[in-house]
Amino acid sequence: MASNFWTSTHYKELKDPEEVNVVHPLDAQRGISVEDFRLIKLHMSNYISKLAQHIKIRQRVVATAVTYMRRVYTRKSLTEYEPRLVAPTCLYLACKAEESVVHAKLLVFYMKKLYADEKFRYEIKDILEMEMKVLEALNFYLVVFHPYRSLPEFLQDSGINDTSMTHLTWGLVNDTYRMDLILIHPPFLITLACIYIASVHKEKDIKTWFEELSVDMNIVKNIAMEILDFYENHRLFTEERVHAAFNKLATNP
């Protein structure tokens, strides 16, 4: 698993933390702040999840789609790449990449159900046109390694057989896609951070197991703090603030 990751395009595409929330000049001209940028990406991550729930797409595909979407916006502007089209297009592309094909017609049907605004009632041709733009923005790198891959092995290896802790850890991993962690850190470190949080919350002493892993626990704890900070600040991510951010995109500079 590790050797595959270290030689993969995913590893080569990892960013420094300060790179992932750089506001594109075209967006900055419209008054988009770093906080607006984060809000829009979070909103579109949630939108991808809602679409997937309607279509009954598995979580791994959702995770890949969110990763694609977040990667796109490390290179392209929100202004030129309309998020409400990019997000479902990334889901469509992720379905192909993860061999869980969904017809564009079905995707468009649920897009129209979730977005009543006529301005964003996209058709199949819009998805197909944006698909090529997204592929180019991704440099055609579609491989994504997820924290899910190492999670069962780590849970078993640590001796954790507590069902509630297992469920908590899986939930934490799911929530990491509401942040940019997958663009910054190797996925197995994200997995370990989630296990660390769950072990502290459930008062499970697996300190010795962590020590035997020979990983930098400072990095693991820093990732854990990022996750906890997200939960702490999540109440500030209101729909009103999301709408205000999107309204800025709609204005001319």
Curated annotation (Swiss-Prot):
Keyword Membrane: yes or no?
Answer: no
Q: What are the leading ranks of the lineage? A: Eukaryota, Viridiplantae, Streptophyta, Embryophyta, Tracheophyta
Task: State the Gene Ontology terms under molecular function.
Answer: cyclin-dependent protein serine/threonine kinase regulator activity
**Organism per entry:** Arabidopsis thaliana
Q: Does the keyword Cell division apply?
A: yes
GO:BP terms for this protein?
Answer: cell division; regulation of transcription by RNA polymerase II
Descriptive protein name: Cyclin-C1-2
Q: Which Gene3D superfamilies match?
A: Cyclin-like
Please give one Pfam family short name: Cyclin_N
SMART domains listed in its UniProt record: CYCLIN
